[in-house]
């Protein structure tokens, strides 16, 4: 398992929130919590950018992926609208999570509620090379559903 030290800056509205952290020793994602003054009610099909109260300085060559928490998704239909959301290494603003309620009931988000998880990943930079032909494969140009449902 690789280790990476990343600086986090606490913003004023983070208040008493702890730094993002791993819930277990085997967790791949750090839990992100809501840094809000008042509860936010997400009605069905509504989406909202929820602040976390922290900014960070990822080193070059890394990204952060914002992903849903499985319990919120399964139990309430609360998920990350642009999953996985991407935070680039040169971004220094507040981490926010775009939550969407795909369930049938209102869902209330409160200060300190764990709303998403953040996974750190290495980035590979691709150099696009224009070509007239592509290597043949068994799948060829078979698209959606071409390998079975």
Label each region the model flagged.
Residues 1-149:
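DUTPase catalytic domain/fold
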């Amino acid at each position: 398992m690789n280790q990476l030290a990343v600086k986090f800056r606490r913003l004023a509205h983070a208040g008493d929130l702890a730094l993002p952290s791993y819930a277990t020793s085997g967790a791949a994602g750090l839990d992100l919590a809501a840094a809000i003054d008042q509860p936010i009610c997400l009605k069905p099909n509504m989406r909202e950018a929820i602040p976390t109260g922290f900014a960070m300085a990822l080193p070059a060559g890394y990204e952060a992926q914002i992903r849903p928490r499985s319990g919120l998704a399964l139990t309430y239909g609360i998920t990350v609208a642009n999953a996985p959301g991407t935070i680039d290494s040169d971004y220094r603003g507040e981490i926010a999570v775009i939550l969407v309620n795909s369930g049938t009931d209102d869902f209330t988000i409160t200060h300190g509620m764990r709303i998403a998880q953040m996974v750190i990943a290495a980035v590979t930079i691709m150099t696009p090379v224009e070509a007239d032909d592509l290597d043949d494969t068994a799948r060829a140009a078979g698209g959606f559903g071409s390998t079975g449902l």
